[in-house]
């Protein structure tokens, strides 16, 4: 199962779905990489006018996946990765309208993502 789903409809609305419902959509490194790819794709595809974020299951996003904390990169590597691929900066400065459809748990990164969006529902 893909941890993040991506689609674009005929109206130019991209939907990015956090798809780890058993883990309450906690964001792991694979999801972070996919979110970056999909943000960039939405920026490059001229037909995309809006991006809607949603979470599958009973939570929007419970934050970072703490099961990966023990295998996390060093502090310097983490800072470099955040600088090179800053998801929140990309979202705050995206050319498209961004909307978070929030429900259930929204903690940590699961609250940061909606706060970076233009609209929260």
Which residues does each PLM region occupy?
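Conserved phosphate-binding and hydrolysis motifs of nucleotide-dependent enzymes
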Residues: 19, 25, 57, 63, ...
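Phosphate-coordinating loops and pocket residues in cytosolic domains that bind phosphorylated ligands
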Residues: 26-29, 62, 71, 116
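Short secondary-structure boundary/capping segments
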Residues: 5-7, 89-92
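Hydrophobic/aromatic residues within transmembrane alpha-helices
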Residues: 16, 53, 65, 113-115
């Amino acid at each position: 199962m893909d941890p993040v789903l991506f689609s674009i409809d005929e109206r130019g609305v991209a939907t990015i779905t956090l798809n780890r419902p058993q883990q309450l959509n906690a964001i792991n490194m694979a999801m972070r990489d996919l979110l970056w790819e999909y943000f960039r794709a939405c920026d490059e595809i001229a037909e995309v006018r809006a991006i809607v974020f949603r979470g599958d299951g009973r939570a929007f996003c419970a934050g970072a996946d703490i099961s990966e904390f023990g295998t996390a990169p060093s502090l310097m590597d983490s800072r470099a990765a955040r600088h090179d691929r800053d998801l929140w900066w990309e979202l705050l400065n995206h050319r498209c309208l961004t909307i978070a459809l929030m429900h259930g748990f929204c903690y940590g990164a699961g609250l940061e993502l909606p706060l970076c969006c233009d609209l929260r529902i």
